[in-house]
């Protein structure tokens, strides 16, 4: 059960990433490998331009289709657009929800996109394949031979998730074993043979505005195989997933230099423990109902209404472990990135990582942040939100 929940929620949260313009434009944190892949250079924070202000805000995604409450939150530039959300799926009780969303800069072309997990199934049982050929769905999972992560990115992710973008050229790919290890993809499980690998590809294309773009797309392939005794002998079934699928993009030549803000946004991602609790209980109920298919959103709502708001100790431990995984995503994806700095927020009594290069950082009780290099700037002059200046750790 935990394995299934981890895979689903993992994509949702690994996806809590974004990319911003490399320029120190108005941006607040707040209330609401193989050749061809460029290595991100480790650079120290550059001083911000005089008078520059970065404003970031915390965006909360409401799961309007399911729980009705916050699913997760993440840090995004205050003037960027968020589109998408969580979709509850009716044909797969073991993966009842997926997420797809994009956060984009309307004044430029930078952005992040999170893609839905892909649940797949394969077997060497020829009789079963005769009834469920490649491309069909078997208990909500697509029947498809197992692929490695780089193959899956090229054969599954790009054709399905970037189908509307013509002229895509893959300019490089890279295996990411440390990312797979950090996510515990392929961790041993009793009674099954597990596997897990991660990779990224970099693509180039011309967007609709005629701007040359670069985009890095990440994914993990993981799954488990198990033997089954039949009258024809022992056959092997495999449930596998392409998950943690997300990308960040920028105009060509600016992708790597956007990394510090991307890392800060990734590290700011937080899943709501109440949503995590309800989601896992829904999976548990559906599996206990012998994989009974939900036939309507009304029926799904009734399932969700039966969840217990009280979070058990075991569920909280599971939640905390999941959050640690999401933190490791930021570490591994951007392990060579510098340009972020750590601050202590006395209001929240917590540490926060923000883009570097700014001399002054302010926060308020709503959890918003303003970064500036202007010594004379005081947000309290133009606001009644009780801004307080915070210091580097």
Residue positions per predicted region:
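Bacterial N-terminal signal peptides that target proteins for export
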Residues: 1-9
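C-terminal motif of bacterial Sec signal peptides marking the signal peptidase cleavage site
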Residues: 19-21
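Short, low-complexity, disordered segments immediately C-terminal to signal peptides
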Residues: 23-44
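Short aromatic-glycine motifs in intrinsically disordered, low-complexity regions
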Residues: 60-75, 252-263
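Proline-anchored loop/turn motifs at beta-strand termini and strand-loop-strand connectors
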Residues: 69-88, 265-273
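Surface-exposed amphipathic alpha-helical segments
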Residues: 80, 244-288, 379, 386-389
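Conserved polar/disulfide-associated segments of primarily extracytoplasmic proteins
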Residues: 86-240, 250, 299, 303-313, ...
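Charged, amphipathic alpha-helical linkers/stalks
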Residues: 279-308
């Amino acid at each position: 059960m935990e394995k299934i929940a981890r895979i689903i929620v993992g994509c949702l949260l690994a996806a809590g990433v974004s990319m911003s313009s490399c320029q120190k434009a108005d941006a607040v944190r707040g209330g609401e490998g193989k050749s061809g892949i460029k290595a991100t250079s480790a650079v120290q924070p550059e001083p911000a331009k005089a008078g520059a202000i970065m404003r970031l805000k915390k965006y909360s995604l409401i799961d309007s289709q399911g729980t009705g409450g916050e699913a997760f939150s993440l840090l995004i530039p205050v003037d960027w657009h968020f589109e998408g959300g969580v979709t509850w799926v009716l044909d797969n009780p073991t993966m009842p929800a997926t997420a797809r969303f994009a956060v984009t800069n309307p004044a430029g072309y930078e952005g992040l996109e999170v893609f839905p997990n892909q649940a797949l199934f394969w077997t060497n049982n020829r009789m079963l394949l005769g009834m469920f050929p490649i491309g069909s769905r078997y208990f909500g999972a697509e029947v498809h031979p197992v692929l490695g992560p780089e193959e899956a990115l090229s054969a599954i992710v790009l054709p399905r998730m970037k189908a509307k973008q013509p002229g895509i050229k893959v300019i490089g790919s890279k295996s990411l074993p440390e990312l797979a290890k950090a996510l515990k993809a392929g961790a041993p499980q009793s009674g099954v043979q597990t596997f897990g690998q991660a990779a990224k590809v970099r693509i180039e294309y011309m967007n609709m505005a005629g701007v040359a773009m670069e985009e890095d797309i990440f994914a993990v392939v993981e799954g488990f195989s198990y033997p089954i005794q039949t009258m024809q002998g022992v056959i092997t079934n495999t449930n596998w997933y392409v998950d943690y699928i997300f990308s960040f993009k920028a105009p060509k030549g600016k992708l790597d230099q956007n990394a510090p803000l991307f890392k800060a946004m990734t590290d700011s991602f937080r899943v709501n423990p109440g949503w995590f609790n309800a989601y896992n209980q829904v999976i548990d109920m559906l599996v206990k109902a012998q994989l009974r298919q939900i036939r309507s959103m009304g029926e799904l709502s009734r399932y969700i209404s039966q969840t217990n708001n009280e979070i058990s100790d075991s569920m909280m431990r599971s939640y905390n472990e999941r959050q640690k995984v999401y933190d490791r995503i930021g570490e591994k994806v951007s392990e060579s990135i510098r340009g972020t700095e750590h601050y202590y927020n006395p209001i929240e009594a917590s540490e926060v990582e923000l883009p570097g290069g700014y001399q002054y950082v302010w926060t308020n009780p709503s959890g918003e942040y303003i970064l500036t290099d202007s010594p004379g700037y005081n947000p309290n002059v133009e606001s009644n939100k009780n801004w307080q200046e915070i210091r580097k750790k």
